[in-house]
């Protein structure tokens, strides 16, 4: 199915979207509506009836709804902000459409929405971006305290926890943290590989996006939790600071729906093995030559304070995808000219070194060394043992 972001969208289709982000994931039964042009047999009649009863949608005032009409930009905004509970705010700030547009702007529902103006048809791309923003927007709800009713925006600030359609209606947890383990290795040690198990990662949680006043989170900050990788490439983010969205599987391990690098984190430097220069144990600097014409090496400061992820005062080292159990000195040597490290043997092969700073605070936190050895098979024994030419082990 094609996305077609520049195509328009109908009033019935946006009504279904509004229902879905409220957690109505299954088919909604067809139902009678108050509109003369939406019979109970219409494919979206149940969604339209439900949204009408919630006060989210209105007709044209003549008894019709126009389900197949193209929806206007400001009508999408109104429906989304009504769904989020901002009707009182909008009515106190000019009503339709001004108050709803103001509410959407204040709550960043229009962030990254390209184009769009009152009186124009909304595009699928605009609706997708607004919906994406809306599900992670704090809900506004009527709250009674001390017998007095007031409206509260559940933004996680002050005394209130953070409530959104994402975590309240859709059962999706948003988390930020460092991937500390995949199905092959942790940052500090290899793991037992179970080929029959569902692939998992582990995440050191830095932020659960619920605010400091939430006491019911499944994920506590500064703790490590497992996640099924689902259809994502989450295992590739070992050592990286990420933001992930995971489907709440109730009392089971949650499944990742999406994962990306965290904004403003994960500074990294890559160089090929032949560009490696030295490691200085006294200064804890790793150096390499950026170019063949450089007269001096570029120095990279490695972390020297206790790491919140692997509880070590030196970087985690991942060698060909597996945690390296040796020291920095055993891998790189300990001073310029010291060629005792394993890296000097590997520099004869092709490969690269990636040095990652996942927190941008105290030096580089993770070192990835990837070595590829080219070899020609000389013999395959009856027992399945390979012998290579050129003395390759």
Language-model segments: residues:
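Feature responds to low-complexity, polar/acidic, surface-exposed segments characteristic
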Residues: 1-45, 54-74, 80-121, 135-199, ...
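Extracellular, beta-strand-rich glycan-interacting domains
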Residues: 126, 131-135
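Short, flexible, surface-exposed loop segments at domain boundaries
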Residues: 129, 139-393
């Amino acid at each position: 199915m094609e996305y077609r972001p520049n195509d328009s969208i109908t009033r019935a289709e946006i009504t279904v979207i509004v229902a879905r982000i409220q957690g109505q994931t299954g088919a909604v039964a067809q139902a009678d509506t108050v509109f003369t042009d939406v019979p109970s047999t219409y494919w979206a009649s149940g969604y339209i009836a439900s949204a009408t009863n919630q006060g989210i949608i209105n007709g044209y005032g003549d008894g019709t709804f126009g389900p197949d009409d193209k929806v206007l930009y400001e009508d999408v905004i109104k429906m989304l902000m009504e769904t989020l509970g901002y009707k009182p705010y909008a009515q106190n700030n000019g009503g339709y459409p001004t108050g709803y547009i103001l509410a959407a702007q204040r709550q960043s529902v229009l962030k990254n929405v390209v184009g769009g103006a009152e009186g124009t048809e909304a595009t699928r791309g605009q609706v997708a971006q607004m919906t994406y923003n809306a599900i992670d927007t704090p809900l506004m709800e009527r709250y009674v305290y001390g017998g007095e009713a007031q409206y509260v925006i559940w933004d996680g600030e002050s005394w209130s926890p953070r409530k959104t359609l994402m975590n309240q209606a859709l059962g999706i947890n948003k988390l930020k943290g460092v991937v500390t383990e995949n199905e092959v290795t942790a940052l500090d040690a290899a793991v037992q590989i179970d080929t029959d198990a569902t692939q998992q990662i582990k995440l050191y949680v830095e932020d659960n996006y619920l605010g400091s006043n939430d006491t019911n989170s499944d994920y506590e900050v500064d703790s490590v939790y497992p996640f099924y990788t689902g259809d994502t490439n989450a295992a590739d983010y070992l050592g990286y600071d990420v933001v992930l969205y995971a489907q709440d599987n109730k009392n089971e391990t949650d499944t990742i729906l999406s994962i990306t690098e965290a904004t403003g984190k994960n500074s990294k430097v890559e160089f090929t093995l032949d560009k490696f220069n030295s490691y200085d144990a006294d200064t804890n600097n790793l150096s390499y030559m950026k170019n063949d014409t450089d007269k001096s090496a570029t120095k990279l400061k490695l972390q020297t304070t206790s790491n919140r992820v692997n509880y070590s005062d030196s970087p985690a080292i991942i060698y060909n995808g597996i945690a390296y159990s040796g020291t920095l000195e055993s891998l790189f040597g300990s001073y310029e000219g010291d060629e005792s490290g394993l890296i000097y043997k590997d520099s004869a092969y092709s490969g690269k070194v990636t040095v990652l700073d996942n927190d941008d605070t105290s030096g580089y936190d993770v070192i990835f060394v990837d070595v590829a050895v080219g070899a020609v098979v000389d013999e395959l024994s009856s027992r399945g043992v390979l012998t290579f030419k050129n003395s390759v082990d």
